[in-house]
UniProtKB/Swiss-Prot annotation:
Its main location: nucleus. This is DASH complex subunit DAD1. It comes from Saccharomyces cerevisiae (strain ATCC 204508 / S288c) (Baker's yeast). It comes from the Eukaryota. The modification Phosphoserine is found at S91. It is found in: Nucleus; Cytoplasm, Cytoskeleton, Spindle; Chromosome, Centromere, Kinetochore. The keyword Cytoplasm applies. GO terms for biological process: attachment of spindle microtubules to kinetochore; cell division; mitotic sister chromatid biorientation; positive regulation of attachment of spindle microtubules to kinetochore; positive regulation of microtubule polymerization; protein transport along microtubule to mitotic spindle pole body. GO terms for cellular component: cytoplasm; DASH complex; mitotic spindle; mitotic spindle pole body; spindle microtubule. Component of the DASH complex that connects microtubules with kinetochores and couples microtubule depolymerisation to chromosome movement; it is involved in retrieving kinetochores to the spindle poles before their re-orientation on the spindle in early mitosis and allows microtubule depolymerization to pull chromosomes apart and resist detachment during anaphase. Belongs to the DASH complex DAD1 family.
Amino acid sequence: MMASTSNDEEKLISTTDKYFIEQRNIVLQEINETMNSILNGLNGLNISLESSIAVGREFQSVSDLWKTLYDGLESLSDEAPIDEQPTLSQSKTK
């Protein structure tokens, strides 16, 4: 009985409807493939961004060291003009 029901449904579907259903399935398949491609691209981008962030974090300690150096130099220049600051040769003789 089930087979006769599907045969009856097939007879009720016109050729135009069959063509529409086939084309709809093709378009849905293309959309699915495109979405998968986009998802793969986004995953690759995510991996690249995570790698870049990891490299940046590796330089954080170096950045902190340079910041400390520049902050120290800035505090020295605020205390005395450059002409009055001792040079290495002057500090060795003291």
